[in-house]
A protein has these predicted regions:
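Surface-exposed binding patches on compact interaction domains or structured appendages
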Residues: 60-93
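Short, hydrophobic beta-strand segments
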Residues: 94-102
């Protein structure tokens, strides 16, 4: 009787594990980025600077990019459409623009990519020289 019970239990458990859904692929396994962070040197007085990130779907399934969220209103990111479906084996360029008016020094902003594979944070920085112009009083 005990043998039959344990055989039945083993059969039920093996069926349970065989039909379990596969673990979702993590963002680090599904998406490969050309860089996690980018920095631009710009001229004093520049109004803006642009960055590009290239992401490749290295998984065997589509990944949907649901949202791009910049850390502030001076930074914007664009994809061809939202949500954007990135097919298995394909890549896409994410264009990022940072407004620089009135800023000096090293400015760093983040961009959070919300996808079906998880969240990814990218960093953009602009190094704006300090304005060294001096004004003469007459």
């Amino acid at each position: 009787m005990k043998t039959k019970f344990f055989c039945l239990l083993a059969a039920v458990l093996s069926i349970q594990f065989a039909t379990a859904a596969p673990d979702p692929v993590s963002v680090s396994e599904a998406l490969k980025w050309d860089a996690d962070a980018k920095e631009n040197g710009v001229n004093a007085g520049a109004a803006s600077t642009a960055f590009t990130f290239i992401v490749t779907n290295v998984s065997k399934a589509d990944v949907v990019i649901n949202k791009l969220q910049a850390s502030c209103g001076c930074t914007a990111a664009n994809l061809p459409s939202m949500p954007y479906t990135l097919g298995a084996g394909s890549n896409v360029t994410i264009n990022v623009e940072m407004q620089l008016a009135g800023k000096q020094g090293l400015i760093t902003k983040t961009l959070t990519v919300d996808s079906s594979a998880g969240l990814k944070t990218l960093t953009v920085s602009a190094n704006i020289p300090t304005d060294t112009k001096t004004t003469e009083t007459k």
